[in-house]
């Protein structure tokens, strides 16, 4: 495994939960505003 592949794997492991958390918070805010 090269350094670039290691970096990509690390980025995906780090980015996936961050993006999921941002999407979840946006959905929660949207649902709260709709009430």
Swiss-Prot record:
Membrane topology: Single-pass membrane protein
InterPro entries for this protein: Toxin_Ldr
Keyword Transmembrane appears in the UniProt entry: yes
Subcellular location: Cell inner membrane
TM annotation in the entry: 10-32
Induction: Expression of the proteinaceous toxin is controlled by an antisense sRNA, in this case RdlD. Only a few of these TA systems have been mechanistically characterized; the mechanisms used to control expression of the toxin gene are not necessarily the same.
Keyword terms, alphabetized: Cell inner membrane, Cell membrane, Membrane, Toxin-antitoxin system, Transmembrane, Transmembrane helix
Alphabetized Pfam families for the sequence: Ldr_toxin
Predominant cellular place of this UniProt entry's protein: membrane
Taxonomic superkingdom: Bacteria
One GO location term (cellular component): plasma membrane
Role according to the record: Toxic component of a type I toxin-antitoxin (TA) system. Overexpression causes rapid cell killing and nucleoid condensation of the host cell. Overexpression induces stress-response and a number of membrane protein genes. May inhibit ATP synthesis due to its insertion in the cell inner membrane.
Family per record: Belongs to the Ldr toxic peptide family.
Listed name of the protein: Small toxic polypeptide LdrD
Name of the gene this protein is made from: ldrD
């Amino acid at each position: 495994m090269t350094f670039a592949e290691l970096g990509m794997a690390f980025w995906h492991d780090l980015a996936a939960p961050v993006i999921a958390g941002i999407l979840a918070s946006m959905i929660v805010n949207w649902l709260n505003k709709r009430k």
